[in-house]
Amino acid sequence: MDKESTLHIAAELENLAVIRRFVEQSATTLGAGPAITSDVVLAADEAATNVVVHGYRGQPGTIKIEVSRTGDALVVCLRDRAAPFDPTSVPPPDLNQPLEERSPGGMGIYLMRHLVDEVTYHTTPQGDNMLTLVKRGLPE
């Protein structure tokens, strides 16, 4: 791991802009260009939004976000203590189905999967949810 930036923040909708700026600044500092930075910021925003809205469901809580670089990969790790939910278990939406026939939701996870190269989830022994987003292609 080359460098790492960490943000601890209350899991509130009002803080999503702070999270986006933090990920953007961290990615840029770690050498990511505009395209990679944009993809990672949007994926992290979708992940954080899911934690706030679906994980904590309006209850107080925090999110810890770590942005690091390993070789040519930018890694964003989100940790929380919200209700466990594995976004990698959600099947992709049927994009051929008319909008009015689709179940609501699921597009954020779909976007996340397509914006980054890897999305992994696990629960730590301490009971934290850990979602890791990996985007490759940073210049050496």
Segment roles from a protein language model:
Residues 9-10, 34, 69:
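N-terminal hydrophobic alpha-helix used for membrane targeting or insertion
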Residues 1-6, 52-140:
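Conserved beta-strand-loop-beta-strand hairpin that lines the nucleotide-binding pocket
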Residues 6-18:
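STAS-typified acidic loop motif
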